[in-house]
Swiss-Prot record:
Task of the protein: This protein is involved in the repair of mismatches in DNA. It is possible that it carries out the mismatch recognition step. This protein has a weak ATPase activity.
UniProt KW DNA damage keyword: yes
Protein's recorded name: DNA mismatch repair protein MutS
Pfam families found in the cross-reference section: MutS_I, MutS_II, MutS_III, MutS_IV, MutS_V
Stated family: Belongs to the DNA mismatch repair MutS family.
Residues where ATP binds: G618, P619, N620, M621, G622, G623, K624, S625
GO molecular function: ATP binding; ATP-dependent DNA damage sensor activity; damaged DNA binding; mismatched DNA binding
HAMAP family (alphabetical): MutS
Keyword Nucleus listed: no
Originating organism: Shewanella woodyi (strain ATCC 51908 / MS32)
Superkingdom field: Bacteria
Length: 858
């Protein structure tokens, strides 16, 4: 809809002038304009809503001489429609009637009370309960990127200074924001173009001084040094934009956003975007959430615990002391079987974290208060369990998960056991909570009782069996009589409404009591709403303590969950050491062993200063990728404080985990499979260190044999000799199995397979040494390649192998046999026939015969 100037506005009706003015103030969102019991949309908004929501597109007369496209939806069903729009990354402005229709001259006063955007959701119905819902902002400066995230449904505010495009890509993958703000002159659009919820913001919102003032005002401090934000200029600019956006959309105080944390990549094991994707931590390769590490590890009982677990998975710690504190707490819970006691209690807590945020925003509903009351009542039992614990970490959690006796007593006295969904209908506050409220309710109830008496009395006096007293909002109270008995109605009855089968009447006595009922009900509802608002004021002084309690309860849930998982899935406590290397005995892939229909074959791995690289060979489907991934996942699990699927594991310092596993064309960026592969390889070779764990799978397969082998050889050599990273290098280039003869810290391992005639059985067992063959034809047969093709391939394979056996074996300077690295090109039958011709020895007849034969071969 084009902008409307003041002259254009005069052409419209007063109501449409009001709408157009509000729409001009909110041009980039759908405007839900409240009219009675409906939200209406007009013009382009109506057309868009009709298309997205499947609601009818109609017209509302004319205004300014033109028909007005209109679509509407009932106010009581708005949450469902909002949920659908949010999933489509569409933002909505909610415009409510704030004036009194009885006293308004012209259109009732309306204003936009909130903006619903994908990154600023707090309504329970709109949120995924087990996933963080993050609003993010990114700012690009000369020294890198500033990145900030805010979860308005919890108050968690985090910033990060990022030096490179790769680091930003990894953060975007880790945080997966629902909405991403960026500045007008952002120059790296290729990094964020894949996100649906991007919003361009004016440059002034990222101004450093403006941002700093916004944050100081929000936190009520004179400086930001106490938050440890020195040198975080770019990320503070991003954070300032976030705060401005949240203030614009929420239009209320935000007391639960009371601190900000700096995320330092050096505090956790760095995982780039490719690694997070390839290891399928919280999202599988198809974009879903099934069969991921999170689904196996997550048996938490609270939504806030589940969300914390996912954050832990994406932020594996490097600080051994913090990891071992988690391990010790887990061990005590496990050895004493405390998780069986804790699970039902923790489950009763619900989602206190998000309830607390809604309290802070003053949009909590009656059932939020009821759930909070129930959660606070559970705390003494949790405290009794924690009081028996010796772990320092559990004792610290016990101090955070403190009891709230005064708040519990207040809520217990105020909120009924099963409150209605909304305060507007009343009936939320208990009888006895407020004497004046009880008085108005009694008057209302007394008037209601009178109506029952009136109905019985009038039935008896008139002899009308169908007579009954009813009420609706339009006509108020009435006496209803069926059409067939309407002739029995006394003259004192005044007709109020005629329906198809009934007549409705009013009498003076009923009118008088109607006024009493409506007056007492209205005053009771008004007072209850006032007392409801005061309830927020009484609870909010404990907001910070409630937030700490929610965080502590979430962590206790994760630790109890880890104990249950360790017991149920036979996980063992890993040992963290300062000695470089990774030693795993009988390791298992945590996801594959749960979804596999056959018993999982456990395998060992040993990486040390003397054994930095393993060249992994074996058949396709033999388990090379599974083996490598399980090493990475076990390492990651050890660094979040979880027990691991292994008989034992001793793990030294790890700073990064890299994976180069699988690839596909990146059509959006115009990159081929091989380009994607080489880009990821380059990132590893530039950033890996001796403390990095590197998984390299089938490097070089996206190009020609010679180029691919050369690149794979050189990359392996560079990782082993130059970087000395802990590396698992899977390959089908058997030439690479000669590397251990040339480089002392490289060793061969292979995954075994056994042939039975033309079939193959994969043993999935890792053995020392190189594989004897690749079993490619057998795997092709298992995949369903037609038998004639398999037979032809066998014939060609025997031909090539026999030629190799007769070739002179030349060795190049690196020790690789020349015929293996650069085999002779395979000649066609036509080429072979041409080479056999001796022109000087042919007669004209022979030459003509050969010419016909060559024509047949061509």
């Amino acid at each position: 809809m084009k902008a409307i100037d003041s002259q254009d506005l005069e052409k419209h009706t007063p109501m449409m002038r009001q709408y157009l003015t509000l729409k001009a103030e909110n041009p980039d969102v759908l405007l839900f304009y409240r009219m009675g019991d409906f939200y209406e949309l007009f013009y382009d908004d109506a057309k868009k809503a009709s298309e997205l929501l499947g609601i009818s597109l109609t017209a509302r007369g004319k205004s300014g001489g033109d028909p007005i496209p209109m679509a509407g939806l009932p106010y009581h069903a708005v949450e469902g429609y909002l949920a659908k729009l949010v999933q489509l990354r569409v933002s909505v402005a909610i415009c409510e009637q704030v004036g009194d229709p009885a006293t308004s001259k012209g259109p009732v006063e309306r204003k936009v009370v909130r903006l619903v955007t994908p990154g600023t959701l707090t309504d329970e119905a709109l949120l995924q309960e087990r996933q963080d819902n993050l609003l993010a902002a990114v700012y690009h400066g000369k020294k890198g990127f500033g990145y900030a995230t805010l979860d308005i449904s919890s108050g968690r505010f985090v910033i990060a200074e990022l030096e490179s495009c790769e680091a930003l890509e990894a953060e975007l993958q880790r945080t997966s924001p629902a909405e991403l703000l960026y500045s007008e002159d952002f120059s790296e659009m290729s990094l964020i173009s894949a996100f649906e919820g991007t919003r361009r913001r004016p440059e002034w919102e990222f101004d450093f001084d403006t941002s700093q003032k916004l944050l100081l005002d929000q936190f009520g401090t004179k400086d930001l040094q106490g938050f440890g934000l020195d040198g975080a200029r770019l990320s503070l600019q991003a954070a300032g934009c976030l705060m401005q956006y949240v203030k614009d959309t929420q239009r209320t105080a935000l007391p639960h956003i009371n601190s900000i944390v700096r995320f330092n990549q050096g505090d956790s094991i760095i995982l780039d975007a490719a690694t997070r994707r390839n290891l399928e931590l919280t999202m599988n390769l198809q974009g879903g959430h099934s069969n991921t590490l999170a689904t196996v590890l997550d048996n938490t009982t609270t939504p806030m615990g589940s969300r914390m677990l996912q954050r832990w998975i994406h932020e594996p710690l490097r600080d051994r002391q913090r990891i071992e504190a988690r391990q010790s707490a887990l061990e005590e819970i496990l050895e004493n079987g405390l998780y069986d006691e804790l699970h039902p209690l923790l489950k009763s807590l619900g989602d206190v974290e998000r309830i607390t945020a809604r309290l802070a925003l003053r949009n909590a509903r009656p059932r939020d208060f009821s759930r909070l009351k129930h959660a606070l009542a559970i705390l003494p039992e949790i405290q009794q369990i924690l009081a028996r614990c010796q772990s320092a970490h559990l004792q610290s959690l016990a101090r955070i998960i403190s009891e709230f006796p005064e708040e519990l007593a207040l809520l217990d006295s105020a909120i009924v056991d099963n409150p209605p969904m909304l305060i507007r209908d009343g009936g939320v506050l208990k009888p006895g909570y407020n004497a004046e409220l009880d008085q108005w309710r009694d008057l209302s109830q007394g008037a209601t009782d009178y109506l029952a008496e009136l109905e019985a009395r009038e039935k008896e006096a008139t002899g009308i069996s169908t007579l009954k007293v009813g009420y609706n909002r339009v006509h108020g109270y009435y006496i209803e009589v069926s059409r067939r008995e309407s002739d029995l109605v006394p003259l004192s009855y005044q007709r109020r409404q005629t329906l198809k089968n009934t007549e409705r009447y009013i009498v003076a006595e009923l009118k008088e009591h109607e006024e009493k009922v409506l007056s007492s009900q209205g005053k009771a509802l008004a007072l209850e709403k006032q007392l409801w608002d005061q309830l927020f004021d009484l609870i909010l002084p404990q907001l910070h303590e409630l937030q700490l309690f929610a965080q502590g309860a979430a962590e206790l849930d994760v630790l109890a969950n880890f104990a249950e998982r360790a017991d149920t899935l036979n996980y063992q406590r890993p040992v963290l050491t300062d000695i470089p290397g990774i030693q795993i005995e009988s390791g298992r892939h945590p996801v594959i062993e749960q979804v596999s229909q056959t018993p999982f074959i456990a395998n060992p791995v040993t990486l040390s200063p003397a054994r930095k690289m393993l060249i992994v060979t074996g058949p396709n489907m033999g388990g090379k990728s599974t083996y490598m991934r399980q090493v990475a996942l076990i390492t990651l699990m050890a660094h979040i404080g979880c027990y691991v699927p292994a008989q034992s594991a001793t793990i030294g310092p790890v700073d990064r985990i890299f994976t180069r596993i699988g690839a596909a064309d990146d059509l959006a960026s115009g990159r081929s499979t091989f380009m994607v592969e080489m880009t990821e390889t380059a990132n590893i070779l530039h950033n890996a260190t001796p403390k990095s764990l590197v998984l390299m799978d089938e490097i070089g397969r996206g190009t020609s044999t010679y180029d691919g082998l050369s690149l794979a050889w050189s990359a392996a050599e560079y990782l082993a000799q130059k970087i000395e990273a802990m590396t698992l290098f899977a390959t089908h280039y058997f030439e690479l199995t000669q590397l251990p003869e040339l480089i002392s810290n490289v060793a061969n391992v292979h995954l075994d397979a056994i042939e039975h005639g033309d079939t193959i059985v994969f043993m999935h067992a890792v053995q020392d040494g190189a594989a004897s063959k690749s079993y490619g034809l057998q795997v092709a047969a298992l995949a369903g390649v037609p038998n004639p093709v398999i037979l032809a391939a066998k014939h060609k394979l025997h031909h090539l192998e026999s030629r190799d056996n007769h070739n002179t074996q030349q060795t190049d300077s690196s020790g690789v046999q020349q015929s293996m690295v650069f085999p002779d090109p395979i000649k066609s039958p036509l080429e072979e026939a041409m080479e056999s011709i001796r022109p000087d020895e042919l007669s004209p007849k022979q030459a003509l015969d050969i010419l016909y034969r060559l024509k047949d071969l061509s």
